[in-house]
From Swiss-Prot:
It comes from Bothrops leucurus (Whitetail lancehead). GO terms for molecular function: calcium ion binding; calcium-dependent phospholipase A2 activity; phospholipid binding; toxin activity. It catalyses: a 1,2-diacyl-sn-glycero-3-phosphocholine + H2O = a 1-acyl-sn-glycero-3-phosphocholine + a fatty acid + H(+). Monomer. This is Acidic phospholipase A2. Its EC number is 3.1.1.4. GO terms for cellular component: extracellular region. Belongs to the phospholipase A2 family. Group II subfamily. D49 sub-subfamily. It comes from the Eukaryota. It is found in: Secreted. Its main location: secreted. Binds 1 Ca(2+) ion. Keywords: Calcium, Cytolysis, Disulfide bond, Hemolysis, Hydrolase, Lipid degradation, Lipid metabolism, Metal-binding, Myotoxin, Secreted, Toxin. InterPro entries: PLipase_A2, PLipase_A2_dom, PLipase_A2_dom_sf, PLipase_A2_His_AS.
Length: 60
């Protein structure tokens, strides 16, 4: 879940860690479009695709 993902980020990076990802790259935060900018952004892309499986999103 998004809540668990946020908890993991805060655990690794500290309490404000999740705030750093609200507008990171193309896919971290709300929405997304284009190609992921790096491995971290790709992780956010894959996370978004998990929730979008019903629309046929394929993160390969």
């Amino acid at each position: 879940s998004l809540w668990q993902f946020g908890k993991m980020i805060n655990y690794v990076m500290g309490e404000s860690g999740v705030l750093q990802y609200l507008s990171y790259g193309c896919y971290c935060g709300l929405g997304g479009q284009g190609q992921p900018t790096d491995a971290t952004d790709r992780c956010c892309f894959v996370h978004d695709c998990c929730y979008g499986k019903v629309t046929g999103c394929d993160p390969k």
